[in-house]
Amino acid sequence: MRIPTLLFALCLVVSFGNAQGVAPTASQSNAVPAQRTCASHDKYVEMMGGAKFSEMRSRIEQQTQRWESQPVEQRSNQANTVVTIPVVFHVVYANGTQNISDAQIMSQLQILNDDFRRLNSDADNTWSQAADSEVEFCLATNDPQGNPTDGILRISTSVSSFGTSDNVKFSSSGGSDAWPAGSYLNFWVCNVGGGILGYAQFPGGSAATDGVVCDYRYVGDMGTATAPFDLGRTATHEVGHWLNLYHIWGDGNCNQDDQVSDTPNSDAANFGCATGHQSCSSTDMVQNYMDYSDDACMNLFTSGQKTRMQALFAPGGFRASLATSDGCAPACTIGCGCTDATACNYDSAATEDDGSCDFSCQGCTDAEACNYDADATEDDGS
């Protein structure tokens, strides 16, 4: 059901009740609780207190509604068929256990691709609204400077737990600085603390903090992955928020929902796997990635959620630049350099252009001057 609401995603687990509760602090127990809930309202109020974020959220929502109102054929003509998003993992660890393996990271990447493309093995026997979101993820092969990378940064830290203050996103506070948000999905892995699974920043916030944070115990489906959140669906849920999806119950009662027309209204989050649970005169979609069911219970995004996510990549969308990012382009490894003979830094020995060509050489461009520089393209007044 579609009833406007604006909520930021800050997802955590606690060990009580099928209702919203008080979030534990980072200093509290790190034990894995049996259920999850969300302290999103406090974070939402905090961010919406800033005029810039509030205004940007309004603009994004207006653009989303314009996109949703277009005929399907018109949307199809404007959108990329499948959007591939480069991902950089920032693994910030205080000990060897937190420094999760490449294999565990790759398992998470595969789960994201399976879930967003509806290739997950548990996709059968679910709601008819289920859809392929046509969003894929690739491990970054080029860093912001165009250098080859494996897309995984490993940063040793003295910080025992980061909480939700975004300190993990800054090297100055023991974390790792974000790569440009217009070209990459930043995915931080760390010990969040306080029983928190992870959190995401909705579109419209600062580029310096844009991305997803997941506790090292809830990434992928191997290694440190811990039941009942050991199938990588925490990341699927959080990336959903990063792509502008709200919780399916709208963080409220039957009078609030998620701005998606084909998700049934619900009066609260669902935990465990409450298949068949009813509220608001309909059956709750507990299998939706944006509810709070256990990982094994989740298996779909809807067609309406797909449209909402795809609006971000449409002309004028907040994340449109990601659709053309070269963060996953084949890296130049042999014979790299500038191959354009008109560039200042032309390399006659280069066999593969690495994107470094510079056409702004300064010098004297007057051929009659004593210090004429034939390579100069911009006169420096000398």
Annotate each predicted stretch with a short phrase.
Residues Y44, V260, S279, C344, ...:
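Secreted/processed peptides and extracellular or luminal domains of membrane proteins
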Residues L7-S15:
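Bacterial N-terminal signal peptides
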Residues G146-P148:
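Short active-site-adjacent helix-start/loop capping segments
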Residues M1-T5:
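Positively charged n-region of N-terminal signal peptides that target proteins for export
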Residues T25-R59, A181, N253, C273, ...:
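Functionally engaged cysteine thiol sites
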Residues Q310, A323, G327-S382:
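Primarily marks secretory-pathway-exposed extracellular/lumenal segments that are disulfide-
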Residues N18-F116:
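Primarily auto-inhibitory N-terminal propeptides
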Residues S27-Q28, A79-T81, V87-T97, D102-D143, ...:
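Extracellular (secreted or membrane-anchored) zinc-dependent metallopeptidases
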